[in-house]
Amino acid sequence: TNDTPSIQQAIDHVSAKGGGVVVVPGDDSFYGKRYVATNIRLKDNVELRIETGAVIWQSPRPADYAYDVVYGHDVSIPGVNWTHAASCHNMPLIHGDQVSNVRVTGGGVIRMQDAGGENLDSVSAGSLWTGCPYKIHLIPLGFFRCENVEISDVHLRRTNNYHINLRTCR
């Protein structure tokens, strides 16, 4: 199941009340409690607390996304020199745009779709991009034109992209 709508509804509710904490609870199982997500948008005065034992897992299913995803690393946009799918088309997994006082905390995991992790040698250039054209590349955490952003005590795993993108934040 796609847990994005439930998480987003909780964020929207907390923000409408003036702010607070949205808790993504974990458990003590070996792999943690999984929440499949596509694009979670933080709002003013909201902390997203991904607790220890919780895993926000990037959905591999295009049908879960609210937009048409682009696969792979590079895409073609006429007139643009370097076009990375995660930077110019696909939305970050967790993001904020022109928001203030947002936090992502809690000790949990943000787990992406890596490229090459299915290979024995997932480091060298020859195998690193194996499977890349078939993956939905997202930036795990992206904040744009925001103020007072805190990212602490979260673990980013198996990302195929920039881990954190902060643009014109103060």
For the regions a protein language model found, what residue spans apply to each?
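Extracellular/periplasmic carbohydrate-active domains that bind, remodel
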Residues: 1-170
